[in-house]
Amino acid sequence: MEKNKVFAVIDTNVIVSALLSRNNKESNTSRVFEAILDGRITPLYNEEILDEYKEVLGRSKFPFYKEDVEMVEILMVTVGLKLGRTTSFEGVFPDPKDVVFYEVRLSKDDAYLVMGNIKHFPQKPFVVTPAEMVSILGL
């Protein structure tokens, strides 16, 4: 049986958690990241999302090497789909930097938004946690 394949915007906190737990292959964030690597998830992004990844992953509080940050960017650009932002969303988020993730997801109807903390986002079926994405993928 072929595993499900999906499009998804991956929030920065999911990437951070996946890299921090990369030695724990059973963590849901690691499984989501692995699904990107093996082609089951096609990540959606734009330049603002890439900039957010680089800025957050480059913070001194994280034990990431420059190569880790570059690898994430190369991965997204190589296997991902670059999209624009929709302008149809007029909601409010506690963190204004989160809006771009939601708007890029709104640019592709059949996509998901994978978030570690979904409580600050509109309750929509396409806004999912890493655990929910693992289930959607049938992992």
Residue ranges and their predicted role:
Residues 17-19, 56, 124, 136-137:
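Residues that scaffold the ATP/ADP-binding catalytic core of kinase and kinase-like folds
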Residues 15-16, 51, 120-122:
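Short, active-site-adjacent cap segments at secondary-structure transitions
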Residues 1-43:
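Short, well-structured N-terminal submotif of metal-dependent ribonuclease cores
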Residues 12, 47, 116-118:
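Short secondary-structure boundary segments
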Residues 33-88:
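PIN-domain endoribonuclease scaffold, especially VapC-family toxins
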Residues 77-113:
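Active-site neighborhoods of divalent-metal-dependent phosphate/nucleic-acid chemistry enzymes
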Residues 108-112, 118-139:
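Acidic, PIN/NYN-like endoribonuclease modules and their adjacent C-terminal/linker elements
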